[in-house]
Amino acid sequence: MQIQANTVGTQAVAHHSDATTGVGRMGQMEARQVATGQDAILLGSRSEPQKGQGLLSRLGAQLARPFVAIKEWISNLLGTDKRAAAPKAQTAVSPEDLQRLMKQAAFGSSLGGFAKADVLNNITGEQLGKDHASLATGNGPLRSLCTALQAVVIGSQQPQLRELATGLLARPIAGIPLQQWGSVGGKVTELLTSAPPELLKEAMSQLHTAMGEVADLQRAVKAEVAGEPARSATTAAAVAPLQSGESEVNVEPADKALAEGLQEQFGLEAEQYLGEQPHGTYSDAEVMALGLYTNGEYQHLNRSLRQEKQLDAGQALIDQGMSTAFEKSTPTEQLIKTFRGTHGGDAFNEVAEGQVGHDVAYLSTSRDPKVATNFGGSGSISTIFGRSGIDVSDISVEGDEQEILYNKETDMRVLLSAKDERGVTRRVLEEASLGEQSGHSKGLLDGLDLARGAGGADKPQEQDIRLKMRGLDLA
């Protein structure tokens, strides 16, 4: 078609006035139909293969386009060579590989289980018996602990860690493997229905010991998950259940973790105790815990214990270190006489003479009666006879106090309780575990120097005739 145009017109509107003659006007332009050449006809009749297969194909291509663009963007970001050959076919994941990946995922999640189990360091034997159902179900700490240990057994690439986790799962707690304490309805539930307080206390002590080793395992698992080089860990042989009569337990890795935890919580205040007793009975972590306690932390820790509050992280570490120290200590052969003063009431206020009571917190006493008098004020002053106390005078920054520290919940028998002329309650206590040969029937009351009377150090206080009749010198 040949078109002759007048460039003056700016708007073109096509209309046909005579279809037969092929003549028409387009605005001010005149159009005339002419014969089409053979080459043009062949070009117009040429057919090409279709790029799509209808509407669905075009819609599919449009939907796929964004994903193709994302793939290209990722390839560019990662530096994929665009000149590479056709993409490789996707390799199917074998069942073995899938199982391995699932084990690795469970192993990584074990850290969360260990974190939940940390609260087991703070519960008592009574709580263990009363709350076992909640501790061993759902996300309870006992259930979480056992699940985490199982994940290490099946997922860790380090044989040492797998052996350690296996040994912990088999560790007897009150004669039943720890693994069974993570569920309800079995032997543990049956045991707890009639377990006496002594058994619950023993079970909790064994669990606390196991938790010390769990802390070391947790650190090793964290290192493996992070891809760090393998660290040495306590093997299953070192943490195997103790047979009857055995007493040696390898606690070095747990002690290291405890020491690092105390340093993290208390900084230089804890570090000052490092190396204080290089060849002594107690480890660095235990010395740190005892030192921190005597250096002011006793107030916060004992208050939380007496009010049955959950211990914070620092208090829990100190409590753990002191507990392991008392487990190591052995009673002295000689009976030790110490003194204790309190400004107000104490755990023995309501304990009658001849009866046994205990303080749920740690019990600080001194060889020096003046220290007890300074602490006593108008409250109470007690004279205590015992053999299980730890002498912390070489550890404490207040070494001149000559402190003898008794473990929490140490049973004491009240031999005597009376008020002096100033209204101060004066008591005589002895460890309930003392035998008859070392107790009060063998001369314990033959010369007790309980306190100072108003008349001075050399004048016996005679106002209470009961004390005089018992042979007690309250001077």
From Swiss-Prot:
One cellular-component annotation, GO: extracellular region
Enzyme class: transferase
Active site (catalytic residues): 340, 364, 403
Listed InterPro entries: ADP-ribosyltransferase, ADP-ribosyltransferase_ARG, YopE-like, YopE_GAP_dom, YopE_GAP_dom_sf
Keywords, alphabetical: Glycosyltransferase, GTPase activation, Nucleotidyltransferase, Secreted, Toxin, Transferase, Virulence
Compartments in which it is found: Secreted
GO molecular-function terms, A-Z: glycosyltransferase activity; GTPase activator activity; nucleotidyltransferase activity; toxin activity
SUPFAM superfamilies recorded: ADP-ribosylation (SSF56399), Bacterial GAP domain (SSF47233)
Superkingdom, taxonomy of origin: Bacteria
E.C. code: 2.4.2.-
Keyword NAD found: no
Pfam families documented for this protein: ADPrib_exo_Tox, YopE
Keyword Ligase attributed: no
Residues in TR mART core domain copies: 260-436
Site entry: Arginine finger: 143
Chief place of localization: secreted
All copies of domain Bacterial Rho-GAP, residue ranges: 93-226
Transmembrane segments: none
Further details from the record: Although the gene exists in strain ATCC 33658, it is not expressed.
Function: Directly involved in the toxicity for RTG-2 (rainbow trout gonad) fish cells.
Annotated protein name in UniProt: ADP-ribosyltransferase toxin AexT
Gene behind this protein: aexT
